[in-house]
Each structure stands twice: as structure tokens, then as C-alpha cells.
Amino acid sequence: MKTLLNYPGSKRRIAPWIIKHMPAHHSYLEPYFGGGSVLFAKRPAAIETVNDLDGEVVNFFRVIRDLESRERLQEWLDYTPYSRQIYEDAFLMEPQDDVERAGYFAVKSLQSHGFRMNGDCGWKKDVHGRECAYAVRYWNDLPGSIAWMAARLKRVQIESRPALDLIQDFNYENVLMYLDPPFVLSTRSGGK
């Protein structure tokens, strides 16, 4: 299963292992949602809530939940090539609306080496030694992936509050909380 976003600290590769170790639960809380790799890989719980303070993440998932906005975003992505110039422009552009904002967020996320919210970390390209240009393939798969992600989010409550407040609000016996806070910047490579 692929995630839509190449988010820092993504658990995409280890999500199956994490889910295998989760106890049975009625309600599920992910107070540090990021790219959502764990939620999108697990079976739905009766009540699910995700949270992220990053307005770009919240906007992206808000856009794909709305049919008209999702279709506009899919068209925007369908006609946006995998391009260094578009990637560089994504850091300079002032989006016209939430759909374009979500589109540029996707460009910055999926066309970069290691997406950072605060700046360019290099356009990702495949040169040799691989079966195909995976970066381009994942980019071209994105518009079609949005529909299943929107369907999965249809049953999910999306918050944008301090995580500790949500942890306190959801502190009940039948609630499973998947807590994966962001990395402390000083512990990341180069402090970035």
C-alpha cells in the first residue's frame, strides 16, 4: 500500500508491523497524523480521529474529502508533469485556492528527496540502476489513488488541535492511540 504523501518520518514501510501489534479496539486516535501511513493501512475502527497542526496536511485531506475539490485536484495533478521547474515553483507560488494549495503540497511532498515543510531539499530523479523511473511512476499514480484515500477518510474525524489536548480528551479504556510525534529537529540529519 502506498501513502499519498512522502512525509518526514513516514511509517509506510513498517505500517504492517505496527498494525500487527495493535490490540483490538473500538476507537482509534492518531494525534500526529502526518501522511497517515498507519491509518490508511489498517482496518477501520468504529470511531476514528486523526489530528495534525500542519495546515498543509489538513488542507490536503480536506480537499480530497470534498467531491468537487477532489475532482479538481485530480485534474490538476493529471495535467501537472513530473518536472524540476514545477517542483521549484511550488516553493515560490501563491496558490489561488485550496485545491491549488493541495496540488503544490503534493508536488513538494512527492517530487522531493525528503520533504521538509520549511524548504526545498532537492528534486528527486531516477538516473540509473533501477527498473524504471519510480518517482515519475508514483507521481502518475497519485490522481487515481486519491479516490480510495477519500473513501477511507469519509468515516474519519479530522482535528487540528494540540495533540496533548486530544490525548487527554480521548483517554478512555477502549481507545487505541497511535502516538508517533514529529522528530525533534536537532535529532534529524543536519538539524533540518
Where are these regions (language model features)?
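Conserved SAM/SAH-binding beta-strand->alpha-helix loop
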Residues: D54
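Conserved SAM-binding loop
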Residues: F61
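Short alpha-helix immediately C-terminal to the canonical SAM-binding loop
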Residues: V58
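Short loop/helix-cap segments at secondary-structure boundaries that form the rim of catalytic
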Residues: L39-A45, Q168-Y172
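S-adenosyl-L-methionine
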Residues: M1-Y32, S37-V38, R43
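SAM-dependent nucleic-acid methyltransferase catalytic core
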Residues: M1-R13, H21, D66-Y178, P182-G191
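A short linear boundary/processing microfeature
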Residues: A45, I64-L67
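Short beta-strand element of Class I
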Residues: I47-T49
